[in-house]
């Protein structure tokens, strides 16, 4: 392998969720259960570790990139503008939230997009509620994934989660309110 050719003594494969947990400072060899939810752009996984082993695991074959796609569709349907993936990601990071009540305090964001009606680029305002709709389903599925992993774990490990909580990793962990 390339690592051996480069002078490494040995090469080990490590689960990405385990690497994220160790990077977050968790001791996976300890008896207390730790739940790590890795929220990436391409996939979302939830892994319950104890004694250095996986006690329960689940994943969604998509990540928060799905929100980007939904933001693009929402902007086109509700505002009549086409935007690119990077603009949708910027809107998600600025206005996106996992908190359902956030639409009550609506925030506007100026964005440039291609006006479908006028066939030219224009600046328009995006409201929080448009992005909230794009986030809701994916957030609900993340909550369902976590519940499923906890439900499938041995009962004695559930008590540890009350003390230890859940560790969120990945770029999607920055979605406002996801840690609630």
Predicted regions and their residues:
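Nucleotide/phosphate-binding catalytic cleft detector across ATP-hydrolyzing
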Residues: 1-41, 47-166, 173-180
């Amino acid at each position: 392998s390339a690592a051996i050719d480069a002078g490494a003594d040995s090469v080990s494969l490590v689960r990405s969720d385990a690497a994220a947990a160790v990077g977050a400072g968790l001791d996976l060899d300890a008896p207390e259960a730790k739940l790590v939810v890795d929220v990436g752009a391409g996939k979302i996984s939830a892994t319950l570790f104890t004694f250095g082993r996986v006690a329960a695991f689940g994943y969604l074959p998509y990540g928060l990139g799905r929100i980007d796609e939904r933001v693009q569709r929402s902007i086109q349907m509700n505002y009549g503008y086409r935007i690119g993936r990077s603009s949708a990601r910027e809107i998600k990071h600025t206005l996106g939230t996992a908190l359902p009540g956030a639409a009550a305090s609506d925030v506007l964001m100026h964005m440039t997009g291609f006006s479908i009606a006028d066939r030219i680029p224009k600046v328009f305002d995006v409201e929080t509620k448009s992005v909230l709709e794009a986030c809701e389903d994916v957030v609900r599925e993340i909550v369902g994934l976590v519940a499923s992993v906890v439900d499938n774990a041995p009962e004695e490990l559930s008590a540890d989660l009350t003390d230890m909580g859940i560790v969120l990793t990945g770029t999607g962990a920055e979605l406002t309110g996801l840690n609630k």
